[in-house]
UniProtKB/Swiss-Prot annotation:
Pfam families: Semialdhyde_dh, Semialdhyde_dhC_1
Keywords per UniProt: Amino-acid biosynthesis, Arginine biosynthesis, Cytoplasm, NADP, Oxidoreductase
Full protein name: N-acetyl-gamma-glutamyl-phosphate reductase
Subcellular location: Cytoplasm
Gene3D superfamilies given in the database record: Dihydrodipicolinate Reductase, domain 2 (3.30.360.10), NAD(P)-binding Rossmann-like Domain (3.40.50.720)
Reaction equations catalysed: N-acetyl-L-glutamate 5-semialdehyde + phosphate + NADP(+) = N-acetyl-L-glutamyl 5-phosphate + NADPH + H(+)
Active site (UniProt): C154
Native source organism of the sequence: Escherichia coli (strain K12)
One GO cellular component, as annotated: cytoplasm
Pathway info: Amino-acid biosynthesis; L-arginine biosynthesis; N(2)-acetyl-L-ornithine from L-glutamate: step 3/4
Gene: argC
EC number: 1.2.1.38
UniProt cross-references to PANTHER family, sorted A to Z: N-ACETYL-GAMMA-GLUTAMYL-PHOSPHATE REDUCTASE, CHLOROPLASTIC-RELATED (PTHR32338:SF10), N-ACETYL-GAMMA-GLUTAMYL-PHOSPHATE REDUCTASE, CHLOROPLASTIC-RELATED-RELATED (PTHR32338)
């Protein structure tokens, strides 16, 4: 049994982690924590997230020193802000824990990336070298030996799952950069109240045009330039990405289908559509990424959907933990 600590459990992704870890037959929740300054400190997780009432009624404990919580802990999930994860991960690693970080603090092995896109100076370049990028379907072997796993961002997960097999198979003409138009539900912005996310203000709108930090994450791990435009949707959760690409001359729809099938035939959390394209409602609340596509001449449109809090965060983190510790990949997820 893996003793498991969830840090930042009060947020949306944190609550989903609580759900998955609680029902995992090989994990035991030792504590749920929030920052010492959090207004949620001392509250029950089930008071903040009533879907957990009668299932997990543990208190959210304030954490100011990891030594209060790290003894005897095998696994730590960090559902915390980037700067917080940056500071906490090394301490938990030093304490002998395996760390799964849902923030962006260790996703890209380039310290200058964090100054430019995250606004802080990275102090642990050696951990950037050591961290395994947790795109579970593609990086499984690296995960098995890693003690620090950087869980990919929500947008990059869907984008890479859709594009990586096609790029690796050399089917795309990358002189025309893939264009990724992605829309996410409001939960992607977290639980903290903001006027722009309030019911009467939220509207379908692009944001972070040419500046969003997920663009370089996607491009770095794909090894290909992309144009990425995120949009805020007026719905609670889920991500839908419409990706436009150019195929190399002579590449057929059958070849695209074959490459995707070969990539994901034995990957249970990626579902391929033989016909048509996926709808968001079919993945919300589920740990899958659904992918469909259409071809017209040399033009390819791929549609990928996922729940941003699940396959885009908590479910993928648990999927990575299952791979790391040798459990069935879908344990506690489906």
């Amino acid at each position: 049994m893996l003793n498991t600590l969830i840090v930042g459990a009060s947020g949306y992704a944190g609550a989903e982690l609580v759900t998955y870890v609680n029902r995992h037959p090989h994990m035991n929740i030792t504590a749920l924590t929030v920052s010492a300054q959090s207004n949620d400190a001392g509250k029950l997780i089930s008071d903040l997230h009533p879907q957990l009432k009668g299932i997990v009624d543990l208190p959210l404990q304030p954490m100011s020193d990891i030594s209060e919580f790290s003894p005897g802990v095998d696994v730590v999930f960090l559902a915390t802000a980037h700067e917080v994860s940056h500071d906490l991960a090394p301490q938990f690693l030093e304490a002998g824990c395996v760390v799964f970080d849902l923030s962006g603090a260790f996703r890209v092995n380039d310290a200058t990336f964090y100054e430019k896109y995250y606004g802080f100076t990275h102090q642990y370049p050696e951990l950037l070298e050591q961290a395994a990028y947790g795109l579970a379907e593609w990086c499984g072997n690296k995960l098995k030996e890693a003690n620090l796993i950087a869980v990919p961002g929500c947008y990059p997960t869907a984008a890479q799952l859709a594009l990586k097999p096609l790029i690796d198979a050399d089917l795309l003409d990358l002189n025309q950069w893939p264009v990724i138009n992605a829309t996410s539900g409001v939960s992607g912005a977290g639980r903290k109240a903001a006027i722009s996310n309030s019911f009467c203000e939220v509207s379908l709108q692009p944001y972070g045009v040419f500046t969003h930090r997920h663009q370089p994450e996607i491009a770095t791990h794909l090894g290909a330039d992309v144009i990425f435009t995120p949009h805020l949707g007026n719905f609670p959760r889920g991500i839908l990405e419409t990706i436009t690409c150019r195929l190399k001359s002579g590449v057929t729809q059958a070849q695209v289908a074959q490459v995707l099938q070969q990539a994901y035939a034995h990957k249970p959390l990626v579902r391929l559509y033989d016909k048509g394209v996926p709808a968001l409602k079919n993945v919300v609340g589920l740990p899958f990424c659904d992918i469909g596509f259409a071809v017209q001449g040399e033009h390819l449109i791929i549609v990928a959907t996922e729940d941003n809090l699940l396959k885009g965060a908590a479910a993928q983190a648990v999927q990575c933990a299952n791979i790391r510790f040798g459990y069935a990949e879908t344990q506690s997820l489906i």
